[in-house]
A protein has these predicted regions:
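Structured alpha-helical segments in the cores of large, soluble enzyme domains
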Residues: 130, 163-175, 189-208, 388, ...
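Beta-sheet entry/capping signal
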Residues: 264-266, 270-272, 280, 423-424, ...
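Carbohydrate-active enzymes and regulators
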Residues: 36, 51, 65, 100-102, ...
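Catalytic or ion-translocation cores adjacent to nucleophile or general acid/base/metal-coordination motifs
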Residues: 283-315, 539-727
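Long, compositionally biased intrinsically disordered regions
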Residues: 699, 706-947
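Often metal-dependent polyanion-binding catalytic scaffolds in large enzymes
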Residues: 1-474, 492, 647, 733-736, ...
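Hydrophobic cores of alpha-helical transmembrane segments in multi-pass integral membrane proteins
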Residues: 34, 619-629, 864, 868-874, ...
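Active-site cores of enzymes that catalyze phosphoryl transfer or operate on phosphate-rich substrates
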Residues: 363, 367, 371, 434-436, ...
């Protein structure tokens, strides 16, 4: 298989001058895949793949009805075995293409670094240079750095269709491709590397890309941990080093004049994997405990490996080197306290002080692992000998002791290498790896509180209370010095309470930082937050200490998801911040109010315009409120991978937030396929972290200087656009008869639910086919599969057209908004990507799946009309003659995939017809289930996203 090259514009041709190497590698990998298909699947399958590939390439060049009929007739003749092999061929081609593009992008960045000139927009060097030009001094930069918190949060939402086995093979192909590209190889070594790539492609072909069984929560936890082992443990120190080097270069004169700087540890990670129980009955207190223990074992294993490696580096011998007095005293103490470390060989490293110290540290970490092994073997920690590290602070003290000794004795350059990297790791990951968030739906807490109150005779009908009475009752309970003992609750409610008790215990046994936020989904009112605090109070997470002072070891993060909930943010948060006891608890937990904003459900609810604008306004309201009350604020952005779920480049997304609302802190979800694309390789992970952090720096200018506010007129225009766009979207999705039938019949939403790509059900309620029941992930995933991508653009065309009505003055204002307002620019940029990924010709074919052909055609025409209107209006406003003109490389990447996606979409349509055909027996229908599910994975790989 070789790569398709579409007809190119002049701009694209210039862009492709630097794209030659990419095309060569795509062609090379495609050729190897073709060889493997021929060898493993046989000539017939190879010829079939080639016929389809070339046929659909020709169809893209010339929309020939006779050729399309011929190709579709040919598809209908293929048996299920051949279809399965054909689908796999295209799916693996997409995986290889994605890997080649990732390697190519990394290679280009390395060329820029080696050339020593200007780097890519969003690099540390580019960002700091612009900040300095804008007047940010090194002192101000230090102030900004001291306020930063950058926290990606990994989730296990069922959108990652790629198996970990395949990711490991693709990682090896990435590294081999790097050897061919960057390293000068002898002809022999080059041939050997090419053979090794072919071997990996053979393994790829021989490894099933579709999971045979649905993953358990434990599987999902391990999948999340995979990215730390494969990339993040190396990428995090690298990104800190990159920032330090850029600061030294940009602020060289200040540093040479004697001004110093420190880059504090501001990168933190969070996770929902094993903690998110909203709608997932398989996440229990036991699985949450297992997640924490797996996290701890993963990170301590890494520390053990790195300490072992350091012992082969810090080999200084006495009397050839000097050590600090503190180091000498520590070694003497360790000889007594940890004598067992040297029991087998007392004189080990006797004259090598750093190696002897590191060996003691290695012994202590080994004891930590032994304790954990007891948990995984017997369900309880092994007996503690007293040698294990109690917490990360003890390990950091030992590492800093070595660091300071090296620096004091002239070895700062040695201290600043591998040892410094390990210190960064411990500062970042502690003994807990990442902060595990707990998420639960609000009604579960209300039910539990109601039973607690009834069982303790505090109140017998909590559900009948008004919101104000609930707040008063709950505040009263929180203010009591003592609460009554609890009886055993009913099953589900006892499980809710067990989670709070588990948090109390593991904060004590593992780390006070083991848990992040307690996220309440579907937060509608202030009592929902107070309910969680009362449950936390019952479990000992907050309350009064022996001195009578308030303490709180729980941070509650209300999640506002729907358009209506976003509009209620101000009264809900005001009620909380005006509650004196809540404020005292908030102060005790760090005086930080975190608020989570749901992109996915708000977009599904009211469309992309209503979602984006209501989220923008919500952030302004939260920022204003918390500032008035003297409370720090952090927004937690619940973004998905696709545009319809808040996706898009992280750097641009951060910059598009309302001016002055970021304030140095940002937390956001990284979901599904985003994880493998961003963190599957060290090199890309370091780049993605850097791009996000540089965006955070730029957006945090308000910490040290006034920032330009949005023109009030722009806000008013956006309000009008949103009103029209939301009305258009709701008219289609809620008021148009037959729309949901169209969705379920045209999109593979039911079939997606059959895929083994996540432990959580695809619907909130089984059998409920309403728009509110289908999860936002399934909603977006399904529209993407059928090439509608509807949630990411519907209503924008109508909104733009109805506002400007071809008035040139109004058009000029919209164009000025694109140039001056990052939010509006990012909105239309993301819309262009969604429009590019849509294909109305193919979507029309999916529309033919409707049982009522006339109704299906009518519905499609409504959607297609808005698509073309949106296409025309967006291009008009951004002043371009085609989509994504500002990002030609990305545009070409998407176009390069089109003729390979086309046959998979047509195969999927054919298989949906066969699988849903109730006129044949179940056995006949089941024949097509496996190849059908494979088309879903293949299209996901080709479009580079799922939900």
């Amino acid at each position: 298989m070789t790569d398709y090259q579409p007809v190119l514009s002049t701009v694209e041709q210039l862009c492709l001058l630097g794209d030659k190497q990419l095309r060569q590698h795509v062609r090379f990998l495609g050729h190897i895949l073709g060889e493997v298909i021929n060898e493993r699947a046989g000539r017939e399958v190879f010829d079939t793949v080639e016929r389809l590939r070339q046929g659909f390439i020709n169809l893209r060049k010339d929309d020939n009805a006779a050729l399309r009929t011929e190709l579709l007739s040919f598809l209908n003749t293929l048996d299920e075995t051949t279809l399965k092999e054909v689908i796999r061929a295209f799916s693996l081609y997409f995986s290889l293409l994605n890997t080649a593009e990732e390697a190519f992008n990394y290679h280009n960045r390395m060329i820029q670094l080696r050339n020593g000139g200007n780097l890519w927009a969003g690099s540390y060097l580019d960002t700091l240079t612009h900040l300095k030009q804008e007047g940010v001094t090194l002192t101000q930069l230090q102030q900004m750095l001291g306020s930063l918190v950058y926290m990606p949060v990994f989730t296990a939402h069922p959108t990652e269709s790629k198996r970990r086995t395949l990711m490991e093979i693709l990682r090896r192909i990435f590294l081999l491709d790097e050897q061919l590209t960057n390293e000068p190889l002898t002809p022999f070594d080059e041939e050997r590397t090419r053979r090794e790539i072919k071997k990996q492609v053979k393994l790829l072909w021989s490894s099933d890309e579709v999971r045979a069984i649905k993953p358990t929560v434990r599987d999902e936890i391990k999948n999340g941990l995979y990215y730390f082992n494969v990339s993040l443990f190396d990428a995090v120190p690298r990104t800190y080093r990159n920032m330090e080097n850029a600061i030294r270069r940009v602020y060289r004169e200040d540093i040479e004049a004697g001004q110093d700087f420190i880059v504090p540890g501001f990168v933190k990670f969070g996770s929902w994997i094993g903690g998110d129980r909203d709608g997932n009955p398989f996440v229990t207190a036991e699985t949450t405990e297992m997640a924490i223990m797996l996290q701890k074992r993963t990170v301590i294993r890494r520390y053990f490996e790195d300490v072992t490696k350091l012992s082969y580096i810090l080999t200084q011998s006495q009397p050839l080197c000097a050590i600090s007095d503190a180091m000498t005293a520590d070694l003497e103490r360790s000889e007594q306290t940890y004598a067992a470390a040297f029991s087998a060989k007392p004189d080990r490293f006797l004259n090598e002080p750093y190696r002897r110290k590191l060996y003691t540290m290695r012994y202590r970490l080994q004891e930590n692992l032994r304790l954990l092994q007891g948990y995984f073997r017997d369900g309880v920690m092994a007996e503690d000998s007293g040698a294990a590290y109690v917490n990360e602070a003890e390990l950091l003290n030992d590492l800093n002791l070595i660091y300071n000794s090296l620096v004091a004795n002239g070895d700062k350059d040695i201290a600043g290498a591998e040892l410094s990297d390990l210190i960064r790791l411990v500062e970042t990951f502690g003994f807990y790896l990442y902060h595990l968030d707990i998420r639960q739906e609000s009604t579960r807490h209300s039910e539990t509180i109601a039973e607690v109150l009834k069982a303790t005779d505090l109140h017998h009908d909590y559900h009948q209370l008004s919101e104000q009475d609930r707040q008063q009752l709950l505040t009263g309970l929180l203010s009591q010095a003592d609460l009554p003992a609890l009886p055993q609750l009913a099953g589900d409610n006892q499980e809710v309470l067990n989670v709070f008790r588990l948090m109390t215990r593991l904060q004590r046994e593992v780390s006070p930082q083991a848990f992040g936020s307690y996220v309440i989904s579907m937060t509608h009112q202030a009592s929902h937050i107070l309910e969680v605090l009362v449950l936390g109070r019952l479990a000992g997470l907050c309350g009064y200490d022996e001195s009578g002072d308030v303490f709180s070891h729980i941070r509650v993060s209300p999640l506002f998801e729907t358009i209506e909930d976003l509009s209620h943010i101000e009264p809900v948060m005001s009620a909380l911040l005006e509650n004196d006891l809540y404020r005292r608890l908030l102060t005790a937990s760090g005086n930080l109010q975190e608020v989570m904003l749901g992109y996915s459900d708000s977009c599904k609810d009211g469309g992309i315009l209503a979602s984006g604008w209501n989220l923008f306004q919500a952030q302004q309201k939260i920022s204003r409120l918390t500032e008035q009350h003297g409370v720090d604020c952090r927004m937690f952005h619940g973004r998905g991978g696709t545009i319809g779920r808040g996706g898009g480049p992280t750097h641009d997304a951060i910059l598009s937030q309302p001016a002055g609302t970021v304030k140095g802190q940002i937390k956001f979800t990284e979901q599904g396929e985003v994880l493998s694309f961003k963190y599957g390789n060290i090199e890309t992970a370091a780049y993605e972290l850097g791009m996000g952090i540089s965006g955070l720096l730029k957006a945090s200018r308000s910490l040290v200087s006034d920032t330009r506010q949005v023109e009030p007129a722009y806000l008013d225009i956006m309000h009008q656009l949103t009103k029209t766009g939301e009305a258009s979207y709701r008219k289609l999705t809620e008021d148009t008869a037959g729309f949901l039938d169209y969705f379920y019949e045209v999109c593979p939403v039911t079939e997606i639910g059959m895929m083994n790509i996540g432990s959580r059900p695809s619907h909130r309620k089984a059998g409920d086919r309403s728009k509110s029941s289908v999860r936002a992930i399934g909603w977006v995933f399904s529209w993407a599969q059928s090439r509608h991508t509807l949630p990411a653009w519907y209503g924008i065309g109508t909104a733009l057209e109805s506002w400007h009505q071809n008035d040139e003055d109004k058009l000029a204002i919209l164009r000025q908004m694109v140039k001056q307002w990052p939010f509006f620019r990012a909105l239309l940029s993301n819309t262009q990507m969604a429009l590019t990924k849509a294909d109305m010709k193919i979507a029309r074919r999916y529309a033919a799946l409707c049982q009522d052909a006339f109704q299906g055609q009518q519905m499609f025409e409504l959607i297609a009309e808005e698509y073309h209107k949106t296409l025309d209006q967006v291009l008009n406003v951004v002043e371009a003659d085609k989509l994504m003109a500002e990002t030609p490389e990305l545009h070409m990447s998407l176009r390069r995939r089109e003729p390979y996606l086309d046959p998979i979409n047509y195969i999927q349509i054919m298989l949906l017809q066969r699988y849903r055909d109730t006129s044949v027996d179940e056995a006949e229908r089941e024949r097509w289930r496996d190849p059908l599910l494979r088309t879903i994975s293949a299209i996901s790989a080709g479009m580079r996203n799922t939900g």
